[in-house]
Amino acid sequence: MAVTIKDVSAKCGLSISTVSKAFNNYADISLETRELVQRTAREIGYYPNAIARTLKTNRSYNLGVLFQEKRGTGLTHSFFASVLDAFKSAGEKRGYDITFINHHIGWTGMTYLEHCRYRNVDGVCVVCADFYAPEVIELVDSNLPVVTIDHSFNNRSCVLSDNIGGLKLLVDAAYQKGHRKIAYVHGEKSSVTENRIIGFYRAMQEHGLNVNPDFVVEALYDNPATSMQAVLNLMNRPDPPTCILLPDDHSTLGAMQAAKQLNLRVPEDLSLAGYDGIRLTQMLQPRLTTIEQDTKRIGAQAAEFLIDRIENPRTAGSETATIPVKLLEGESMGICPVKTDAANS
């Protein structure tokens, strides 16, 4: 015989109404009661009917995720994989599943907003996309609850990693090791890039250092080949930098290859630093100096913002959370090998 909500009610010693409210996350049901009901349901093998719950609450308990990564790494990129895993876990704790939003259902093309409506999602988290694309703006401007990661819209909640602070930590670390000729190889145009460039210039200014415009160059994120070429160009200048900050940890692989081609030792002759704090790069020799982003907190906070907006539309306003980052001091950034002019120190 199939297990029913009545069985859960009897096992918990609660009314059917209370058990139903617990399953549907009503605000007047305590967390302790919800956990008791959910734990009991698992123990006796009861699972609420999703269709019935949708009819009762007018919600699908389904969160859309827009993830359009064009560099080819997709969910193999540890930053995005970790953020999405935390988002998924936080959503599941509050009774929500996730659905990826795209352009197609089979052979049928549609906009992101149309796909959201087709899938009947309660809200959407934009994790990675061209935030300036008309289709993304259409989605953000719709009446659907939306939260964004690492990009801010005036009328939407967002979760930002402290990209300005991250570059400041790297410049501070380089300065403390005697570096004055510091170059920054940044990624392609995005809100993340813009904030990191601001952080670089701001930190250099705080240390009284002039920024050589030729020392701020563009490469592609997660593309070691373009960073390798950027480093070769920088180091072939008459007065090259002594320390180079890269767009991300993967890009430092290209930078290290460039140093090898030029017969430069890292960090004795050239210091390098990455960004993201990918665990695998901590196995490099020398161990990489980098910035670790709190991906778990980013994903969890995005889920909380979105679900609060879904469940409390009249009281949950647009919020912004800036998540702190952490400097991982490795061995790829060393003491500056040459003396610098006092005027530039």
Roles of regions detected by a PLM:
Residues 2, 48-49, 109-110, 132-133, ...:
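Structural motif corresponding to alpha-helix initiation and N-cap regions
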Residues 25, 29, 51, 75, ...:
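Conserved acidic
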Residues 43, 86-94, 141-147, 152-345:
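Bacterial carbohydrate/catabolite-sensing allosteric modules
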Residues 33, 76-79, 135, 193-196, ...:
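Residues at alpha-helix caps and immediate loop-helix transition turns in enzyme cores, especially N-
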Residues 1-61, 340:
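N-terminal helix-turn-helix DNA-binding module of bacterial transcription factors
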Residues 58, 62-172, 176, 234-236, ...:
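Alpha-helical recognition/docking segments in bacterial nutrient-uptake
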Residues 43-49, 105-109, 128-129, 256:
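Short gly/ser/thr-rich secondary-structure transition/capping motifs
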